[in-house]
């Protein structure tokens, strides 16, 4: 009987692993990491930055709202300068006497188109600015008076229009109380002549006036 020995390399090896020191869990003896406290001045800095940003946003929204309100009130308000200017220009352009004084080249089929603009800052027509001059005043009765002037130009002549309007109690549009045009070489022409104030004299006694005059 012959015994054969197996080589050692062919014998399977069994390896033993120890879990000692390789546990993923935390033992009861380990200390938890301490969280660092944020300094007070860091918190104050963050709070200050947030407050400043909030104020800037709120301020920007407020300024934008005011600007938008002013633009809309100027463009669409009946008492705004734009609406008042357009009404005055239409009224002056439709006046036949004004067109004659400006020597407009009108025919039965077509009328010359006039140019209306504000002040002449420079003599150069290409670079001059043309803002409309307008002011407002409150009289002793609490009514607002609107004063405006602008130029009206034809191909041959140039005139300066003066306008006065007063806020109306019946409607939202101011009423024109005075409007005239000055043209070089021509007499002043009134499109709307202002009404003269009536002076009421007190009753007299024995032919002599009693008391002061009242306007």
Swiss-Prot record:
What protein am I looking at? Mitochondrial import inner membrane translocase subunit TIM21
Question: What's in the keyword line of the UniProt record?
Answer: Membrane, Mitochondrion, Mitochondrion inner membrane, Protein transport, Transit peptide, Translocation, Transmembrane, Transmembrane helix, Transport
The family annotation for this protein states: Belongs to the TIM21 family.
Is-annotated flag, keyword Transit peptide? Answer: yes
User: Would you say which domain of life the source belongs to?
Assistant: Eukaryota
State where the protein is found.
Answer: Mitochondrion inner membrane
- What PANTHER family does the record point to? MITOCHONDRIAL IMPORT INNER MEMBRANE TRANSLOCASE SUBUNIT TIM21
Q: Which segment is the transit peptide?
A: 1-15
Bilayer topology reads:
Single-pass membrane protein
Q: Which residues form the signal peptide?
A: none
Q: For side Mitochondrial matrix, which residue ranges?
A: 16-55
Q: Is this entry keyworded Transmembrane? A: yes
Protein purpose: Essential component of the TIM23 complex, a complex that mediates the translocation of transit peptide-containing proteins across the mitochondrial inner membrane. Required to keep the TOM and the TIM23 complexes in close contact. At some point, it is released from the TOM23 complex to allow protein translocation into the mitochondrial matrix.
Listed under subunit, the entry gives: Component of the TIM23 complex, at least composed of TIM23, TIM17, TIM50 and TIM21.
GO BP of this protein = protein import into mitochondrial matrix
